[in-house]
Design a protein with these regions (language model features):
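Helix-rich, well-folded core regions that mediate interactions or catalysis
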Residues: 1-218
């Protein structure tokens, strides 16, 4: 149930333990997140993306957007290598829809960036590239027709799935379904990313959404 989701995510991910072991760190990082010249660039990028985060959603008041910004600024101070990357705004906003305390949301975001989407948000996106290769191999093994369909359309797997991963399926699934997936991510961790992605491709194949038999030359 939604009312238990925040506590469950914090406990299952280990974020609650990290928060309790380092009380006050969030406030320290938030204060530090505006001290360096490069922090101003990060803040400007966050400000631009805030207005693109779930546009029209009733929860995104000015006060709520400020909470998103605070969490992202604090994380940029914690992890300068990542600082801020598009996609993190959606993940943070979704976390804050369930988690009231900014420090708790900060630790959940830290878990996502550092243990679920490892090296996805860095400039090289090395972790993302590796995970996409793993997913392509899984699809070849479990859904071999999918690869053929995509090649016929001149599409790569990452063209479809990059935003699935970077936004943790927020842009791919209805909200209630997506948050059930998040329940599994915080419980079972990274393997859920691949299981859900393969299942989505399987559903598309079952419903002929990847059927290219009617596609011909323009």
């Amino acid at each position: 149930p939604d009312e238990h989701r925040a506590d469950a995510w914090l406990l299952l991910s280990g974020a609650a333990q990290k928060r309790n072991e380092q009380p006050g760190l969030y406030a320290t990082l938030l204060a530090a997140g505006r001290m360096r010249p490069e922090d101003l660039q990060v803040e400007e990028q966050i400000d631009r993306d805030l207005h693109r985060t779930f546009p029209g959603h009733p929860a995104l008041t000015d006060a709520f957007c400020q909470r998103i910004k605070n969490v992202l600024l604090a994380y940029s101070a914690r992890n300068p290598e990542v600082a801020y990357c598009q996609g993190m705004n959606f993940v943070t906003a979704a976390i804050l829809m369930f988690v009231r305390a900014e420090d708790s949301a900060f630790w959940l975001l830290s878990h996502v960036v550092e243990e679920v989407l490892v090296d996805h948000y860095v400039q090289s996106m090395l972790g993302h590239q590796v995970d996409q290769q793993v997913l392509e191999q899984l699809l070849e093994q479990q859904l071999p027709h999918v690869g053929g369909h995509l090649r016929t359309l001149s599409l790569s797997v990452p063209f479809i799935t990059t935003q699935w991963f970077l936004c943790l399926f927020l842009n791919a699934l209805p909200s209630e379904t997506c948050f059930r997936v998040w329940d599994l991510i915080f419980c079972l961790h990274r393997c859920t990313l691949f299981q859900v992605s393969v299942a989505l491709f399987g559903a598309m194949e079952d419903h002929s959404l990847l059927d290219t038999s009617d596609i011909g030359p323009a």
